């Protein structure tokens, strides 16, 4: 896919989304996050089931340690299913603790930060990888962030295009 040719898809049908809120997100209901995730999935052409887990840093550390052998918490992890196995695109896990800290540093709401991390995770489930794609994921994330009315996205922050005035952000270690 050429970075300059990407446009959000117009896929309309509903796909199953599972939202698991182990922690309550201020200003964001389960239903609102489900609607947002569905819009983001449609925009990148995901027509398969997705699960989004909102949890704490302790569980994120355990997931990161178990699956990636990294013994620290992180803000978002994505676990794509191979080739959308059985109509399932994959899982996304988000740390509410780290999201809240980064939201304070970036001076936007925790609910916006959760949406940013959800979008980032969905892009990974769609097969994008900012570590190796020469900026394609960053461009798509920027376009979708603007389309969806979100503040600076993860890759923009990590690349230094927008810095926090309060110090370093905890970056995604996907």
Give residue ranges: language-model regions:
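An acidic/histidine-cluster motif and surrounding catalytic segment
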Residues: 2-114, 123-174
């Amino acid at each position: 896919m050429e970075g300059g040719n990407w446009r959000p898809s117009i896929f309309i049908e509903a796909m199953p989304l599972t939202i698991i809120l182990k922690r309550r997100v201020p200003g964001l209901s389960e239903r609102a996050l489900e609607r947002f995730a569905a819009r983001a999935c449609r925009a990148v052409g995901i027509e398969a089931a997705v699960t989004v887990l909102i949890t704490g840093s302790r569980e994120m550390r355990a997931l990161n340690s178990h699956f990636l052998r990294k013994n620290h918490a992180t803000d978002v992890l994505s676990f794509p299913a191979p080739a959308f196995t059985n109509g399932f695109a994959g899982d996304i896990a988000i740390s509410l603790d780290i999201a809240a800290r980064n939201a304070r540093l970036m001076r936007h709401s925790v609910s916006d930060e959760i949406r940013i991390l959800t979008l980032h995770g969905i892009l990974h489930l769609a097969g994008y990888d900012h570590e190796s794609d020469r900026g394609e994921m960053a461009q798509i994330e920027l376009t979708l962030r603007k389309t969806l009315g979100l503040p600076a996205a993860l890759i923009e922050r990590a690349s230094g295009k927008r810095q926090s005035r309060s110090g370093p952000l905890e970056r995604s270690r996907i």
